[in-house]
């Protein structure tokens, strides 16, 4: 999971085990190639973040990599909070089909990204794109915003 602390935009992929190769691939594909190279990345001290491959990538990209304090989960409080919200959204989608949670990850991320955040005064989508997302229900019901686009 990657979170932009300013906009609260969340990127997440499902994986059975977090390896250094997975982390490096995530940073390149889900962060750098989509939003540009970050100045700094804060991560936990999991083995996926401590591998030589990730260290080399950070050096090549010029990214400062900071690790959170061990045994102090409050350092990653935002990540833990958002991950909990994503898990709640997924659990409402899957009900008893827990083996299929990864199939609902993108829908859960969409729901989170387009939900109003009181602390920000906007949705993460709005802060990233400069406008609110056009929701499928608005198209279905021909909302004023859809009619104005026509």
Predicted regions and their residues:
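Integrase module of LTR retroelements
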Residues: 1-150
